[in-house]
């Protein structure tokens, strides 16, 4: 059960980034501006993740509640994440560029609250698993992540059966609730020791790593878009000539 949520959140992001986000960006902004809209959404989402994850993870290390250190973040984060998914499902109006702003706000909401749940959740392995078993636990985490990515990627083949993009979002909602419920109900946190004095140097190091990771993610997404639509995407996002064409 410890790795179940990794499947849910990996499925969640794979389906959004591969299926719903590109489709909705095209619907909202139209073919002419879909690259610009998609690039803007991805860049803002990466920035939100870069800022939120390390601070939330560090904060969850330092709080003490009757329900544990991580569970409150998972419950609140997934609940708010689900509300954001509902907004993403129903906000966009095809061909109406004015709905791009509320869509970006909803996407930022989902990105932030998913980090609220996922950053503390990622600390459950060192919290719960003895050092000699962490390799196995990490292997299960990797397996569930790959399965989630795979299932999220092929969900597009089921869009007709699911009723389109809205149905995909409701499937993601169910997956997130099931993953969070499995963790909250069946994974018991140990009593936490008193927190050590806060180390700002460590936080600065983590922020640096997340910053480079976010920049890398933005670059990889841009390159992926270029390869898929070489005559459209780069010019729409950056307003430059596509040097990758031909």
What are these regions (language model features)?
Residues 38-63:
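Central cavity-lining transmembrane alpha-helices of secondary-active solute carriers
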Residues 32-36, 131-140:
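Loop-to-transmembrane helix entry/capping segments in MFS-fold secondary transporters
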């Amino acid at each position: 059960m410890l790795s179940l949520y990794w499947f849910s959140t990996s499925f969640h992001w794979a389906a959004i980034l591969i299926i719903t986000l590109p489709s909705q960006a095209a619907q909202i902004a139209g073919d002419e501006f879909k690259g610009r809209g998609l690039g803007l959404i991805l860049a803002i989402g990466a920035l939100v993740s870069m800022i939120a994850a390390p601070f939330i993870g560090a904060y969850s290390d330092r709080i003490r509640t009757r329900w544990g250190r991580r569970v409150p973040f998972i419950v609140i984060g997934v609940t708010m994440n689900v509300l954001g998914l509902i907004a993403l499902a129903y906000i966009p109006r095809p061909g109406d560029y004015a709905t791009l702003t509320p869509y970006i706000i909803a996407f930022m909401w989902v990105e932030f609250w998913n980090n609220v749940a996922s950053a503390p959740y990622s600390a459950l392995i060192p919290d719960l698993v003895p050092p000699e078993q962490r390799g196995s636990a990490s292997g299960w985490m990797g397996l569930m992540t790959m399965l989630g990515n795979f299932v999220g990627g092929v969900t597009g083949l089921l869009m007709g059966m699911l009723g389109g993009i809205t149905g995909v979002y409701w499937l993601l909602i169910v997956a997130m609730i099931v993953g969070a419920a499995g963790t909250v109900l069946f994974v018991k946190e140990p009593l936490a020791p008193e927190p050590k004095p806060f180390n700002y140097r460590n936080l600065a190091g983590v922020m640096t790593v997340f910053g480079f990771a976010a920049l890398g993610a933005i670059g990889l997404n841009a390159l992926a878009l270029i390869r898929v639509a070489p005559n459209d995407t780069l010019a729409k996002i950056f307003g430059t000539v596509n040097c990758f064409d031909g």
